[in-house]
Amino acid sequence: MAQEDVFKKIVSHCKEYGFVFPSSEIYDGLAAVYDYGQNGVELKNNIKQYWWQSMVLLHENIVGLDAAIFMHPTVWKASGHVDAFNDPLIDNRDSKKRYRADVLIEDHMAKYEEKIAKEIAKAKKRFGDSFDEAQFRATNPRVLENQKKFDDLHARYTEAMQGPNLEMLKQIIEDEGIVCPISGTKNWTDVRQFNLMFSTQMGAASDATSKVYLRPETAQGIFVDYLSVQKTGRMKLPFGICQIGKAFRNEVVARQFVFRMREFEQMEMQFFCQPGTEMKWFEYWKKVRLAWHEALGMGNENYRYHDHEKLAHYANAATDIEFKMPFGFKEVEGIHSRTNFDLSQHEKYSGRSIKYFDPEKNESYVPYDVETSIGVDRMFLSVMCHSYCEEKLENGETRVVLRLPEALAPVKCAVFPLDKKDGLPELAHEIVDELKFHFNTHYGDPKDSIGKRYRRQDAIGTPFCITVDRDT
């Protein structure tokens, strides 16, 4: 089955079984805005709890925070978001659709990688255990041709994104013959920048002084509160501050279900350390965070690092942990060495010292920072994509089994009375009442056959089911 068809089935399954609904659906919905249903919210909460326990509860030098969504507007001036939080956009004149120019080019580069992967897969199937991939890559003409095209395009793209050079981005799109996915034409406008922040007015006045922003990231709340947390918690470097919360970006090209939305949730940690030690901690958290993902048992081969070619204005190192979705490897978590940029900017714009006093060195300085940031919705999608499985039954029918990691399953256990007789429902309810204080437990009404009840629990990823019969 084509991966595109698999993804459509996953989206349909999410709606049918109460994981994700289109928001405001009775009013025909709102583009790229979704609600999490009764099973989706449990899965999402379990993801957040799994992360919080591993990051906050298991580390003595990491604490939590819940900062406000609205912040003083100067915060976003200091952070660079007002002036630099932009995407390069391009329109197709025929379809009237708008795209991110960088994404169009990256998707085009991925096609060269896909061609190489197909050649390797065919050769591996043909030669079996004797296949030497390194030699094949170095000698096969088709692989070499596509690798050269990829390398040449990658070099031009990297150069264009420094700045970025908008004219060069359009030139690449034209030179590569990239077409609009809707119209199939190459009738493109010029590339221009678009700021991604949502703004609104606070209070009764509606002038420039009342302008505030919906936060585009959760990190800045940690930065402006870092000194308060450090002093009240008597924290010593290195230490981390974690936060889970909503962020908002006016994505022009929101797509791929909950992967890219305008309202989304982040799980972030800012880890503060001595200047000069940030790269050591960057490498440390890269390994720790990948191990956390792999511990879920979704296949180590489905994860990879992707180092950033173009660094954000605040970073001196950055990498993504990518997961293999049905539409390719995509970022689920970012690890960034943000230097002391953010804290220094807030010190500059606020006019207040937020330096850390190091008692061992007997000096004050602005700490450096290493960030780990997960998109909760992307994590949710990666779990659903990996867990979705169709099984062929002996009678030719197909059933869906959601093989969720047990720690994340919305319902941990379902209890089924075999039928309505001999006090079996009452006994089943007693078992549910005892278990529900420990984990989410579901009672399966005996009006349906036992087979249907089991199949429904398979479809929502329940790892354990108990049948109460006359021998119980």
Label the model's feature ranges.
Residues 1-472:
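NTP/phosphate- and nucleic-acid-binding module
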